[in-house]
Amino acid sequence: MNTKNFSPEAVPRCTPAEASAPPGQFPFTRGIHPTMYRGRLWSMRQYAGFGNAAESNRRYRYLLEQGGSGLSVAFDLPTQIGYDSDHPLARGEVGRVGVAIDSIEDMNVLFEGIRLDKVSTSMTINATAIILLALYVATARKQG
């Protein structure tokens, strides 16, 4: 593959710092991996999550077994806005359009048997982003 098209001379509107770094090096204007998609395909992921953590875990494992290389976690509405599943305002919404996550135990079950250091994960999160990210990081640390 011809990579000369992306040299600083070929892209004059970029600053030297933006255009001169090779792929995989700061400032990552040419990608985060040294060979990018020539050596590693993009992540294949399906937006999924429903019911409880165990049901969603079964779905994620199935998707990975079928060739998926990443996960896109769909959280239910109560989780996205910060309500526990037993909160009165969550009634009728728990697990309907995504997985219900109320605790670190739920997050551990969600990713049980899935090596987070081997699978890229995206999460559609709103106001509770910092809480769910903290639970995700704690789960990853528990896995080692």
Regions found by a protein language model. Give the residues of each.
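Catalytic alpha/beta active-site cores
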Residues: 1-143
